[in-house]
Amino acid sequence: MGLCYSVDRTTGKEPGEASSTATTAETVEERSGSGRWRRPRDLKGGGDIEGIPQVLGRLVSNGSSKIACLYTQQGKKGTNQDAMLVFENFCSRDDTVFCGVFDGHGPFGHMVAKKVRDTLPFTLLTQLKMTSESDQSSLVGANGFQIKCTEEEEVQTTESEQVQKTESVTTMDEQWCELNPNVNNDELPEMYLPLKHAMLKSCQQIDKELKMHPTIDCFCSGTTSVTLIKQGEDLVVGNIGDSRAVLATRDEDNALLAVQLTIDLKPDLPGESARIQKCKGRVFALQDEPEVARVWLPNSDSPGLAMARAFGDFCLKDYGLISVPDINYRRLTERDQFIILASDGVWDVLSNKEAVDIVASAPSRSTAARALVDTAVRSWRIKYPTSKNDDCTVVCLFLQDSSVAMEVSTNVKKDSPKEESIESVTNSTSKEEDEIVPVKDEKIPESCGIESKMMTMTLAECISVAQDDEEWSALEGLTRVNSLLSIPRFLSGELRSTSWRKWL
């Protein structure tokens, strides 16, 4: 409620309205000593910020804006553990936007995902502000990442942050060099290095706060995180876990292409596996799912985590699991159309190209994310009819104005060869309504007709269809039942919480 209170202050409400806000604050104050209700705190990235959804330009539920749309749908495994975020005018800059998708797992995965979603942007703002104060020259320039904190984003540095501010960042720098040996700093804009350091520090701080959180048990619960910050034509993407970011761009022939911006950080990747084994963790796949490598404790067949990096999951943090993001930079061009951020519930059943084509062929920008989620859900029923589909979450960030996209779409239609137009006769009706026309040589009818097929196909036919489909590579998605197989049983109750929180 702290942020709600500051928003009311700046908007100049009537006295009657202000009194209602004060009453709400008093109510929270009275409940601060019980259960999950806690005293409102400042926006340092570590507290429960009740009023965050009221920040202008911040979207966390199904909806859309002029430049983005987002949609999530609960799977058949229980509570929806996915979270998403679109934060426009980030850092109070009109040309800057922050987007993220967070896929939780474990008993409290939904709480961890929402916690990271709510705290990461403001923690990043805090770290950027600290960097700007300590080294302003590194942030100001032609492409500088200048920070202008509004009253809602103003952060007061606490004693714990003062301690972290004096800590050396040598360890993170070494990790960065090991993870990105081929990065040439001369080719990067001035805003990149400060932002990279701020992202590394923010993830480290959030993981520490999760470990000490009084109401969220993160011992065997965690979340992935795929985030992006777009400032002008500069794009910075950070990835922890197996959620994914994909860019839709056009080649010289105006054909729509899918470019994967992140790597699915699976335990069987050579670098990830080497680090885990060096820390005495184990990496192997079970016999009934040989294609899914998992992380296991040294002396216990648990928890079986299907990713090499994650927030939380402190039972594995001493055995190779890390929360260091894989950060990449890309300079956007006029050929780039949109970016898709999605959880693995989408990528397990759809390839990058299929996802790009579905978004491009959506009736409108506001329905693009939902169209992709709906197609993913139907694909789960077709490909794996006996499995429970996972939560599916999509964030679409559009890089071009709708008028520009329509013009490009028209040019593609005029320049398309005759032989390619024959293959696209079945899609001619939908193309007239599209803002961005998909590639002509891609076969879309299968995804478009899934719902009608489901009405007539028997279970045996569905299984045969799934078996006839081509195999999926590691980049296109893996089929698995759960991100976390089992929970290790050591101590119970307060004894366990006291034990693992001493690992700081």
Swiss-Prot record:
- Which SUPFAM superfamilies does the entry link to? PP2C-like
Q: Which reaction does it catalyse?
A: O-phospho-L-seryl-[protein] + H2O = L-seryl-[protein] + phosphate; O-phospho-L-threonyl-[protein] + H2O = L-threonyl-[protein] + phosphate
CDD domains linked to this entry: PP2Cc (cd00143)
Biased composition of type Low complexity is found at 17-26
- Which residues of this UniProt protein bind Mn(2+) 2? D103, D344, D390
* Top-rank lineage group of the source organism: Eukaryota
Which cofactors is this protein said to need? Answer: Mg(2+); Mn(2+)
Q: What is its EC number?
A: 3.1.3.16
Any keyword Manganese? yes
Task: Output this protein's name.
Answer: Probable protein phosphatase 2C 18
